[in-house]
Amino acid sequence: MAASNGEKSLIVSFGEMLIDFVPTVSGVSLADAPGFIKAPGGAPANVAIAISRLGGRAAFVGKLGDDEFGHMLAGILKQNGVSAEGINFDTGARTALAFVTLRSDGEREFMFYRNPSADMLLRPDELNLDVIRSAKVFHYGSISLIVEPCRSAHLKAMEVAKEAGALLSYDPNLRLPLWPSKEEAQKQILSIWDKAEVIKVSDEELMFLTGSDKVDDETALSLWHSNLKLLLVTLGEKGCRYYTKSFRGSVDPFHVDAVDTTGAGDSFVGALLCKIVDDRAVLEDEARLREVLRLANACGAITTTKKGAIPALPTESEVQSLLKGN
């Protein structure tokens, strides 16, 4: 399903883009942080840039505030080779901000400023349908499902992409502080579950969505549905597990000195989508899929070695050097 003009097919990422404020030192509370580094982020935007860094073709669809941060973020997308044609600017709401506490092990805790932020106010009639219809893969999360009108815009975009023949890719990217309750988060994340053909969840998200205290095959397969082509469970420093209709298995991690896990999952997803957009047969060939997932694990690992998501997303050459060294 390659693009007719010989260039790579388009992957469209839908959802939020925001500014993360990350403490200059790890292992302190937000109150005790001596200062913060401003880092662009937002999972769907991270995925789009991850794809572009690896040589893929990506576009982002979402809404930013018509403010300095919003225009800065749109500029960062363009600088990284991501099409910004699908971006709207809201004159009445600000670009979202998140303060991210880095624990000493590189894991994170979040405090969000979105009341409401521009991304929440994207309306169905503002969608750039031409961009969405051009997608061979349409990728999204669940944060855009939390409130209207963005929820309706999300559902419309999914429907349009699917009708145009796109592969639907879903990474729930659970951020509980943004939801009114745990129950609502679980309900809404699962409300669109059976639409996606590729789904990636973390081990923690797997336990949250199933109510299980185990991360095993039985728990993962309880989330399987008939439209799925690939279900992935990322295990952080333990690698990942994969499930298809015909086979299942696990791929070992790369061991690196993790500084900040922000964006690692997005980097993983970007690498996967980059490799399957023009070659969906990979999803039915276990040996080739394992190769792709090894590369995706390498991308995730490299991303943890620097602070912030977007600055840490690797290039193809960085990934190849890690692969060759292992």
Swiss-Prot record:
Pathway: Glycan biosynthesis; starch biosynthesis. The keyword Glycoprotein does not apply. Keywords: ATP-binding, Carbohydrate metabolism, Kinase, Nucleotide-binding, Transferase. GO terms for molecular function: ATP binding; fructokinase activity. It holds the Pfam family PfkB. It catalyses: D-fructose + ATP = D-fructose 6-phosphate + ADP + H(+). GO terms for biological process: fructose metabolic process; starch biosynthetic process. The keyword Isomerase does not apply. GO terms for cellular component: cytosol. Its EC number is 2.7.1.4. It is an enzyme of class 2 (transferase). May play an important role in maintaining the flux of carbon towards starch formation. PANTHER family: FRUCTOKINASE-4-RELATED, HEXOKINASE FAMILY MEMBER. Belongs to the carbohydrate kinase PfkB family. This is Probable fructokinase-4. It comes from Arabidopsis thaliana (Mouse-ear cress).
